Amino acid sequence: MARIAGINIPVRKCVPFALTYIYGIGIATANVICHACEVDKRKRVSELRDEDIEKISGFIRQNYVIEGELRKEVAMNIKSLVEMGCYRGVRHRKGLPVRGQRTHTNAKTRKGRSRLPIAGKK
């Protein structure tokens, strides 16, 4: 396993797909990183030289918020919405869909399992 930005990425995969194992980097961002670092997208991680890995790692560190920092930032954004009491914050607090989706027949995952009363002894 190669280590980029503190994350072990699989060596058998092509570089852009392997970079998506890092939280905050999708396939489009991974392609931009490969282009900026002049790394062939068809290369596998195992074929990269150490200086290529260092170049990719440095580019990510300088230009992107990833992993723990990104998770913390997202959590703080949600927390501020909840504290403001705005519509999106209320939806987060209640555990309902936030972006205007229908909830009458869908949103089972977001709403959770319905709790049916369990019949006791008579």
Curated annotation (Swiss-Prot):
Q: Which Pfam families does the entry mention? A: Ribosomal_S13 (PF00416)
UniProt-listed SUPFAM superfamilies: S13-like H2TH domain
Presence of the UniProt keyword RNA-binding in the record: yes
Keywords for this protein? Ribonucleoprotein, Ribosomal protein, RNA-binding, rRNA-binding, tRNA-binding
Please give the residue ranges the record annotates as the region Disordered: 97-122
One annotated Gene Ontology cellular component of this protein: small ribosomal subunit
Q: Which InterPro entries match?
A: Rbsml_uS13_C, Ribosomal_uS13, Ribosomal_uS13-like_H2TH, Ribosomal_uS13_bac-type, Ribosomal_uS13_CS
One GO term under biological process is: translation
PROSITE patterns from the xrefs? RIBOSOMAL_S13_1, RIBOSOMAL_S13_2
Give one GO term, molecular function aspect: tRNA binding
On whether rRNA-binding is a keyword of this UniProt record, the answer is: yes
Q: What does this protein do?
A: Located at the top of the head of the 30S subunit, it contacts several helices of the 16S rRNA. In the 70S ribosome it contacts the 23S rRNA (bridge B1a) and protein L5 of the 50S subunit (bridge B1b), connecting the 2 subunits; these bridges are implicated in subunit movement. Contacts the tRNAs in the A and P-sites.
What is the annotated quaternary arrangement, including any partners? Part of the 30S ribosomal subunit. Forms a loose heterodimer with protein S19. Forms two bridges to the 50S subunit in the 70S ribosome.
PANTHER family (alphabetical): 30S RIBOSOMAL PROTEIN S13/40S RIBOSOMAL PROTEIN S18 (PTHR10871), SMALL RIBOSOMAL SUBUNIT PROTEIN US13M (PTHR10871:SF1)
Report the family membership: Belongs to the universal ribosomal protein uS13 family.
Q: What is this protein called?
A: Small ribosomal subunit protein uS13
- Which gene specifies this protein's sequence? rpsM
